[in-house]
Amino acid sequence: MNQNPEIACTANSITLELMKELYLLKEEEVFQNFPDHKSLNNIMDVVYDLYYKDWPQKIIIDRGPVLTTGNPGNFELMKIHYKRPFKCIVLLRDLMDVLASYMKWYTENPDAFPNRLNLKNDEEKLRYLMQNDGGIAKELNAIENAFKHSDMCHFVKYDDLTTDPEKEIKKIYTFLEEPYFNHRFIDLDQIKINGLEYNDGIVGKNMHTIKRNEIKKEYNSYLEKIPKRIKEKYGHIRF
């Protein structure tokens, strides 16, 4: 989507975390000692506007699990503080595909973060990745809630995107009610937005590196290497 100069599809975004951390200040003694909800809410109301104030693009696709629910979750906070309608693009990929991709990555890149945690084997690493407060669990929670709010969501199946990317991208433009931009689907660029790129030294080399030649799903042999107990527990999560 970033080939279109009018659109920015962000890297993994911190905006939802900003809003949640501001909300959690309400649990601190210093706030409860002088509970000025209105003033703090004023800041929460403009998190997105301030964060993206200097971005030149017309449309920002903010990548984060906005539909996660809780007490409150991201979805509840957004409904209160964003103050305008918003749409969600939801990517669906079978969980075993996701875990196999992680296995391939951390096996081929010794500095990958699961290898830094004194975890003994693949089963321990995958269980760590699937912990309740981890990124995968948050995304699954968001997807579950997305199906309850399908009127505001557009669902993109990973297999469809990698089989006919142009068709799926056109559907996204229709959902956004924006004119189609002629994208190229070969000779792809690594993600770079407003001059910034991922620093994968933080999480492990190549975590966000894409294959540049073309968009195509390739068989991942690590599917056969996923431990049996992981398959038994999570293998039913398919889209």
Please report, for each region that a protein language model flagged, where it lies by residue.
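PAPS-dependent sulfotransferases, especially Golgi type II membrane carbohydrate sulfotransferases
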Residues: 106, 147-148, 166, 174-239
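Short, structurally constrained coil/turn elements
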Residues: 3, 54-55, 82, 149
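Glycine-rich phosphate-binding loop used to anchor ATP phosphates in small-molecule kinases
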Residues: 48-74
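A generic structural motif
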Residues: 5-8, 59, 82-86
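PAPS-dependent sulfotransferase catalytic domain
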Residues: 65-183, 197, 201-203
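CE4/NodB-like, metal-dependent polysaccharide N-deacetylase domain
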Residues: 46-56, 139-147
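Broad structural signal for hydrophobic residues in well-ordered alpha-helices, predominantly aliphatic
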Residues: 1, 51, 78-79, 172, ...
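PAPS-dependent sulfotransferase catalytic core
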Residues: 1-48, 54, 191-196, 205
